[in-house]
Design a protein with these regions (language model features):
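Long low-complexity, intrinsically disordered regions
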Residues: 287-292, 296-315, 320-324
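Class I SAM-dependent transferase core
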Residues: 1-116, 125, 147, 160, ...
C-alpha cells in the first residue's frame, strides 16, 4: 500500500473529483502526520488493538497509513495507555482518507474562505485546509494538550503555520470569527451555539453527529440570514469518536422496585436491522443507550436513560412472555424505543439523508424532510 494506490482508490470512489482535492492530496504527505507508533482498529487474538511500530515493521506501518478506508489510531483512553497492543477506547486518530475527502467535498470550500477547524489532532486535515485557502485563513482548535503539541510540531515541520489554539472547540475560537466554514472532526450530540455565532450568514457547519443510541451521521448545517440559527440535512454516514465533553455517560441509580410485562415485538426486529435504523430511532430517543448481555437463550438487551434513573431489560429468547420485559424507574424505555421503531416503519423506513437538524440558542430539534415535520410526529 502506498500513496499511488490510495489515490487510485479515492479517484475510483469519486472522492477526488475536485481539482483542489487532487492537488492537496498529492501535496500533503500523510506519512508526515502519522506517528511512528499507532494502533489499528483490528483486534488480536487476546482482544487487544493491533499495535504497529514503524521502526519494527515499516511496511505494515505504511500499509496502515495509506489504507483508503481505515483510520489510524494515535491515542487510547485520553493518553493513559502506553505503547503496545492494548484494549481501550479510541480518543485520537488520523481519519481514513476516504472520509477526510468526503467531508472536504461536502464543505464546499472556496479559495477565499475563512475556516474554523475543531479538533486538529495530527494536523493532516489542517494541512489540507491550508492548501485550499491558505494558512492565514485557517484557525484550528485542539482540546488535548499532548495531541496539540504533536500536531503543531508536525504542521510546522511540513511548512504550515495556521493559527493553532489549545482549548475547548465547543467554544469556537477566542475573538469569534466570523468564519465562512466550521468543520468538526469528532462526533457531537448538541450543536454549540458558539459555532453559529461565529459563522457568517450562509456559512456552513459540517460535523459528525450522533445520539447516545447511535453515532452514524454527517450533518451539514447552513446559518440563516439572522445569524442566530442553523439548519440542514445529514449528507452521509460517519462514525467518529465523541467530542470529549459530550461523551455519553450514565451513572445508573434506579430504584430497586421494578415492573414486568411482555414485549410487543421481537427485539431483533428493532435492534438487528442495521445502523441506519438505529440512527433514526436514536433521533427520537437521543438520551437512551443500550448494551447487550449474554449469549444464546440467555441473550438480553439493557436500555438506560442518560439521567440514570430509568432502565429496562428485554429478553430475546421468549420476548412474548409476561416477564420478558423488566422496567425500573419512571420511564418505560423499551416502550419509547418501540414507539420510535413503529414511527420509522410507518414513514417507509426513510434514509438517513432525509433527516435534518435545526439548531439555535434555545436548543435543537430533529426533523424529517422539512423543518416543520418533527421526528416522531
Amino acid at each position: 500500500m502506498n500513496r499511488a494506490i490510495c489515490r487510485e482508490a479515492l479517484v475510483t470512489a469519486g472522492l477526488l473529483r475536485e481539482p483542489w482535492l487532487r492537488q492537496a492530496f498529492d501535496t500533503v504527505d500523510r506519512e508526515a502526520f502519522v506517528p511512528a507508533a499507532v494502533w489499528l482498529d483490528v483486534l488480536d487474538e487476546e482482544g487487544r488493538w493491533t499495535f504497529v511500530d514503524r521502526d519494527e515493521d515499516p511496511e505494515a506501518w505504511r500499509r496502515a497509513v495509506w489504507n483508503p478506508y481505515r483510520s489510524v489510531i494515535t491515542q487510547l483512553n485520553d493518553g493513559a495507555v502506553a505503547r503496545g497492543p492494548s484494549a481501550g477506547d479510541f480518543t485520537s486518530s488520523v481519519s481514513a482518507p476516504d472520509i477526510v475527502m468526503r467531508k472536504l467535498q461536502h464543505l464546499d470550500l472556496r479559495v477565499n474562505a475563512r475556516v474554523l477547524e475543531i479538533g486538529y489532532g495530527s494536523g493532516y486535515h489542517t494541512a489540507l485546509l491550508c492548501e485550499r485557502v491558505g494558512e492565514e485563513r485557517v484557525v484550528a482548535v485542539e482540546v488535548d494538550e499532548e495531541v496539540a503539541r504533536t500536531g503543531a510540531s508536525q504542521l510546522a515541520a511540513a511548512g504550515y503555520e495556521p493559527e493553532l489554539i489549545v482549548g475547548d472547540g465547543l467554544c469556537g475560537a477566542p475573538g469569534g470569527g466570523p468564519f465562512d466554514r466550521v468543520i468538526n472532526t469528532a462526533a457531537l450530540r448538541r450543536v454549540p451555539y458558539a459555532w453559529i455565532e461565529q459563522s457568517r450568514r450562509s456559512g456552513v457547519i459540517l460535523t459528525p453527529f450522533g445520539t447516545a443510541y447511535s453515532n452514524a451521521g454527517l450533518l451539514k448545517l447552513r446559518v440563516d440570514g439572522t445569524g442566530t440559527r442553523a439548519q440542514g440535512r445529514f449528507v452521509g454516514e460517519s462514525s467518529y469518536m465523541w467530542i470529549r465533553s459530550q461523551r455519553p455517560t450514565v451513572d445508573l441509580r434506579v430504584p430497586e422496585a421494578s415492573t414486568s410485562r411482555s414485549s410487543p415485538v421481537d427485539p431483533a426486529q428493532v435492534l438487528g436491522l442495521g445502523h441506519l435504523q438505529d440512527f433514526a430511532i436514536g433521533l427520537q430517543v437521543p438520551d437512551v443507550s443500550y448494551s447487550h448481555q449474554g449469549e444464546g437463550p440467555a441473550r438480553r438487551v439493557q436500555f438506560v436513560d442518560e439521567a440514570g434513573t430509568s432502565a429496562t431489560i428485554v429478553r430475546y429468547g421468549d420476548w412474548w412472555a409476561q416477564d420478558a420485559v423488566r422496567c425500573w424507574g419512571p420511564r418505560d424505555v423499551w416502550a419509547e424505543v418501540t414507539a420510535a421503531y413503529t414511527w420509522y416503519e410507518l414513514q417507509g423506513r426513510p434514509h438517513l439523508t432525509r433527516f435534518g437538524i435545526t439548531a439555535g440558542q434555545d436548543g435543537q430539534f430533529a426533523w424529517l424532510d422539512e423543518p416543520g415535520r418533527l421526528v416522531g410526529s
